[in-house]
Amino acid sequence: MSSLDVEEVIETIEMIRMRNLDVRAVTLGINLLDRAHPDPEELARDVREKIVEVAGDLVEVVEEVEDELGVPIVNKRIAVTPCSIVAASAVRKEGREAVLTLAEALDEAAEEVGVDYLGGYTALVYDGFTEADEAVLDTIPEAIEGTERLCASVVVADERYGINMDAVYRTAEAVKETAERTDGHGCARLVALTNAPENTPFMAGAFHGVGQPEACVNVGISGPGVVRAVVEELKDVDFRTLHDEIKRTAFKITRVGELVGRRVAERLGVEFGAVDLSLAPTPEEGDSVAEILEGIGLESCGCPGSTAALHLLMDAVKKGGAAATSRHGGYSEAFIPVSEDAGMARAAEEALTLEKLEAMTAVCSVGIDMVVVPGDTPVETIAGIIADEAAIGVVTGKPTAVRIIPAPGKEPGDEFEMGGLLGRAPVMDVSDYRPTMFRRDGRIPPKFPR
């Protein structure tokens, strides 16, 4: 072994032990199209059987790889073909009850194989609704209330088709009802998406796209603590040097993620899909994207200059990660969820406003994520927030999303506790002015091509 090899091994060990490096998620995508059936009970039974058959060894294999490599793997997850596609014929026969039966079966399968979450209770409605899309969208609050692991997503916009404003408003209604049914907590498992990637390992927006293989493993990396340590050691360098060092660090982090993903896929006998290069924070101190930005030179995340600092970070991470693997996918950006990032939650009590957060999402993916707002926030306001993020996605071509939590009984400045990796966050203030335009029907067209 060369001295360089030894040095790299030591650096990796230090990243894991001292700087919270982990693999955030290993997600097994499973195609369910071959289990479509017009009878809801048979559909549910066949889907559950296939998930247990394909994913039965997932948790055991992931834990074996974790022990062998010494790399912590935080979450094991499953993503399936969107339910609005799989259940289309059953919905035609039995209506909305067909997708609720399927939701229950998916949650039971997730519990049986031992994964943390299962994504794919999804409606792809960026250019209109099918009968099954409407069934999924209308039942999201009930499905989330009745399950523990099921995640729901609605793809409301796409850069090629524009924004389906009817879908935006109905998704906002689903968010509001879900909050009322679950005391806000269920909204962590519901997201509105634009330009949704079909191979992301991250919830709540993960689903297994129809262009994906029969089954594949996608991996989500972490590493904010590692990047933060690098930034803190380079306080006096110029921006180009800082960019280069972040890029080199992202390269190493991505290598770890790909190694884990390939080994898990090989042992499960499925294809290796992609590494999502996103920096995913946690509520743990020191594992924060906001603290990276502050290390670059912000007094508090959200102050002027925050968007530029985030752009520098994202460009370096993407370039370093792309050099490390040819199989990058998903969002591959920095995540800035408020409740899941202790630094972002702290910033929301200081310089960070909802409007500044929206501006920052223009240079990174995911968007308005895990933001807690007052429980009496009107549906029109939630729809406006979703539409604004969708517009950013349509114009830039980037994946964007909204995962917003109206906390019943809470007012601006109150604290809302989610628990675990979902963390806690202050309730952020929203404008008192309502966007009454969202009572209109129809679509906002895509941008004119350059």
From Swiss-Prot:
Q: Which domain of life is it from?
A: Archaea
Query: Which Pfam families does the record cross-reference, listed alphabetically?
Result: DUF711
Q: Which SUPFAM superfamilies match?
A: PFL-like glycyl radical enzymes (SSF51998)
The record's annotation in InterPro entries points to: UPF0210 (IPR007841)
UniProt family annotation:
Belongs to the UPF0210 family.
**Name of the protein:** UPF0210 protein MK1214
Look up and give the organism this protein is from.
Methanopyrus kandleri (strain AV19 / DSM 6324 / JCM 9639 / NBRC 100938)
Which taxonomic lineage does the organism of this UniProt entry have? Answer: Archaea, Methanobacteriati, Methanobacteriota, Methanomada group, Methanopyri
